[in-house]
A protein has these predicted regions:
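Extended, low-polarity transmembrane helix blocks
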Residues: 1-32, 49-61, 68-131
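Membrane-interface interhelical connector segments
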Residues: 31-46
């Protein structure tokens, strides 16, 4: 791996960018907790308050682990966000359960989630990089 300052800066910036959505969603959830709970009620999850709190924790803690990569454990944050992102497909974007045009809209969201997972996998691979 290249051992340059530019590479390190790019790596740090990429960690922020790959987690940006999760930071924004987690911070929004902290300040709009009732709305997050209602989303969990809408999709029929049991214990919506617990799931809402878990969602926010996962988004913020996973992002922090990736960005700060303490002792090389950023891969745990990547894993947290990968599992979270994949679970949102059947729980929140079950495109197969809808008719058109909503089916296509939800399918596109699911594809975007798969793309995010690819970025998170790369962040897990780079978690072991040391300057």
């Amino acid at each position: 791996m290249p051992n340059s300052t530019l590479f390190f800066i790019t790596l740090c910036l990429s960690r922020v960018l790959v987690t940006f959505f999760f930071w924004m969603a987690g911070i929004y959830g902290v300040f709009h907790f009732a709305e997050i709970v209602q989303e969990r009620v809408t999709v029929g999850l049991p214990w919506p308050v617990l799931f809402a709190a878990g969602t926010i924790f996962c988004q913020l803690a996973g992002s922090a682990l990736i960005v700060f990569n303490p002792a090389g454990y950023g891969w745990i944050g990547s894993g947290m966000l990968i599992v979270f992102t994949l679970l949102t497909i059947p729980l929140g974007h079950a495109f197969w359960a809808f008719s058109e045009p909503r089916r296509t809209e939800e399918f596109h969201i699911a594809l975007e989630h798969i793309t995010v997972v690819g970025g998170l996998i790369m962040s897990a691979l780079f978690a072991g990089y040391r300057r």
